[in-house]
Amino acid sequence: MTKQEAYSSSLYLGVCAALLSLLFTNQNHIIGFSLLSTFGGYLFLRKQSAKSYLPAMAGAVALLIWKFSMIHILLVGISSLLCVMYQLPYGVSLRNNGILKPISIAFAWTLNTVLLASADQFEFIPNDHSVIFSTLSVFTLTFILALYYDLKDSAEEEHKNSFAVKIGIRYSFRVAIISMVTLILFGIFYFDGITKETVALSGATVYMLFIHSKILNGKGSTYIIDSCFIVYALIFLAFKHLIQ
């Protein structure tokens, strides 16, 4: 990945994170933090120069100190720890553990979007803004996209021991579709009907068919995979406005 590709794709991921946060909060500082921390974090993970990611990270830290509560800081601390553990030397890095790699990525994204946005209004009962189901949705979606990332990069040495590459594209696709369909059915039962959450997940599941076909043809790209977040978020927002 070239310097320009790393910069633009990291920025795109930052926009994806901000859009996901927008689904769960209208607080600009939380949305801005998700954008800056994801953008800077991915530049760091992609081993870009400090001058490329430090401005974004500095902006994120400034927002954290100025606007966030202790529960927010705790969540950010956990997410930052995962980021550091992901980048540790070979043998102890989360990046090099076949199954922990997609789990850690999914957990970090969930912390940095839905849980960070919902930290001050967490409820354990089904309601219009269900943190529990949204947490499951973002975690599952990110976990599956992490598998697709490894399949896209399967020719590279660092991805050859990944969970997705070991089980192959066919079984990875089955894991993806079965997981998404199970979550959608659970959501219909959980909310006692079709909601914006389940409709958005359905749209993301259909989009995964497109990702799968592109990877099979050797044309998968970071933008094609990451756009699944955009599809999910836009359908969520559109359906939300339709039912209001």
Predicted regions and their residues:
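N-terminal membrane topogenic signal
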Residues: M1-S10, A50-K51
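Small-residue-rich segments of transmembrane alpha-helices in multi-pass membrane proteins
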Residues: Y12-L19, L54-L64, P102-A117, V165-R174, ...
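Helix-coil boundary and interhelical linker segments in multi-pass alpha-helical membrane proteins
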Residues: C16-F33, V61-L75, T113-L136, F186-T195, ...
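Hydrophobic core segments of alpha-helical transmembrane domains in multi-pass membrane proteins
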Residues: I30-F39, H72-V84, S134-T140, K196-V206
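Solvent-exposed interhelical
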Residues: S34-A58, F139-T182
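Intramembrane alpha-helical segments
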Residues: Y42, A50-D120, M208-H212, L216
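Functional transmembrane core segments of multi-pass inner-membrane proteins
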Residues: P102-S154
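Extended hydrophobic alpha-helices typical of membrane-associated regions
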Residues: T198-Q244
